[in-house]
Amino acid sequence: MSFRKSNIYLNLLNSYMIDSPQPSSINYWWNLGSLLGLCLVIQICTGIFLAMHYSSNIELAFSAVEHIMRDVQGGWFIRYAHANGASFFFICMYIHIGKGLYYGSYRAPRTLVWNVGVIIFVLTMAAAFLGYCCVYGQMSHWGATVITNLFSAIPFIGNDIVSWLWGGFSVSNPTIQRFFAFHYLVPFIIAAFVIMHFMALHTHGSSNPLGVTGNLDRLPMHGYFIFKDLITVFVFLFFFSLFVFFSPNTMGHPDNYIPGNPLVTPASIVPEWYLLPFYAILRSVPDKLLGVLAMFGAILILLVLPITDRSVIRGNAFKVFSKFFFFLFIANFVLLGHLGECHVEPPFVVMGQIATVIYFAYFLVIVPVVSTIENVLFYVGRKNAK
């Protein structure tokens, strides 16, 4: 027996990363998992080095970021790698979720993998919001004010929760300090859930583009798919480097280069681009409490897909109607992202409300109805074939 199999620790690594049998038909959409792991490593490593030079005191936070940029050797690279790493993390995560929606990765027996993935998604959004506030630029201050104020929509105890979160009567020094503490902690919680995600995936193995269970036509992870992953890793690093070195502020907001000022309200308060679709849903509902419920519901509704999808065939590879509505959903999601950065004025308000209805209808109406129709067509076609 080889040493990698006889050693208790190396055997665990071997079963997950070397000899793990993978479907031979998986394509490059299955490489997003390794890219997300790379993004998480980049974020944790750059975040640790940034924390060495950052001060969470509200009087020093903005200056500390400028100190990192100007005085720390290589500080500009660490800061830009961390900021753009967050954007690339969400790019990969949205594509990964889209792949899961298209190929039915949420279907049994991989429902647990999907549910843990949704938890990782929520935690990543929380970490991104907390980190955005730590810069304490103008948009950071007002973004923190708006988002934390959402808890005031909770009946009876909402205002008390907001004051408790702030540590005072407005976003102040205790707020930024506790946000930084949680921002440092959450990535390690995400890493723990990533391990759980990996363990749940290892139980039944990866799905495949065909949507069928094939335990015979498989190849070992190392030698085949490790090399395949490396191709997309280098492509990712190429585009990541383009942004870090040549256009580091493209995915940021210019107002965040102004120190946070509670006396001056920006013309438009918007979060980072990767939170815009859900921000648009929040703004599309006139009632504050219902808007908050809609925003959080838009994220957690991913958990209902294993229940609402009634199709007997996993994935959309061979389903024409499901393909059409899936791409309609993607276009609608992109539209929500654009509407999230627009001013609250006609016609954007009505467009946001229509896009919000379509978003929820996809999960609660379109998927179950279309999957049922396709089931009927499948059984009729199979009966006629006999």
Swiss-Prot record:
Transmembrane regions listed in the UniProt entry:
32-52, 76-98, 113-133, 179-199, 225-245, 289-309, 321-341, 348-368
What keywords are annotated for this sequence in UniProt? Electron transport, Heme, Iron, Membrane, Metal-binding, Mitochondrion, Mitochondrion inner membrane, Respiratory chain, Transmembrane, Transmembrane helix, Transport, Ubiquinone
**Any single GO BP term:** mitochondrial electron transport, ubiquinol to cytochrome c
Where does the chain bind a ubiquinone? H202
Q: What does the cofactor field's note say?
A: Binds 2 heme b groups non-covalently.
What are the record's GO terms for cellular component? mitochondrial inner membrane; respiratory chain complex III
Q: Which residues form the signal peptide?
A: none
Matching Pfam families: Cytochrom_B_C, Cytochrome_B
Which GO-annotated molecular functions does the record name?
A: metal ion binding; ubiquinol-cytochrome-c reductase activity
Please list the residues that bind heme b b566. H96, H197
- Mainly resides where? mitochondrion
Can you tell which superkingdom this protein's organism belongs to?
Answer: Eukaryota
Q: PROSITE patterns this protein is in?
A: CYTB_CTER, CYTB_NTER
Its topology with respect to the membrane?
Multi-pass membrane protein
Record: residues binding heme b b562: H82, H183
Compartment(s): Mitochondrion inner membrane
Q: Which cofactor does it need?
A: heme b
The UniProt record's further free-text remark is: Heme 1 (or BL or b562) is low-potential and absorbs at about 562 nm, and heme 2 (or BH or b566) is high-potential and absorbs at about 566 nm.
Its family remark reads: Belongs to the cytochrome b family.
The record's subunit annotation is: Fungal cytochrome b-c1 complex contains 10 subunits; 3 respiratory subunits, 2 core proteins and 5 low-molecular weight proteins. Cytochrome b-c1 complex is a homodimer.
Q: What does this protein do?
A: Component of the ubiquinol-cytochrome c reductase complex (complex III or cytochrome b-c1 complex) that is part of the mitochondrial respiratory chain. The b-c1 complex mediates electron transfer from ubiquinol to cytochrome c. Contributes to the generation of a proton gradient across the mitochondrial membrane that is then used for ATP synthesis.
Would you tell me the protein name for this molecule? Cytochrome b
Q: Give the organism's phylogenetic lineage.
A: Eukaryota, Fungi, Dikarya, Ascomycota, Saccharomycotina
The record's gene field reads COB
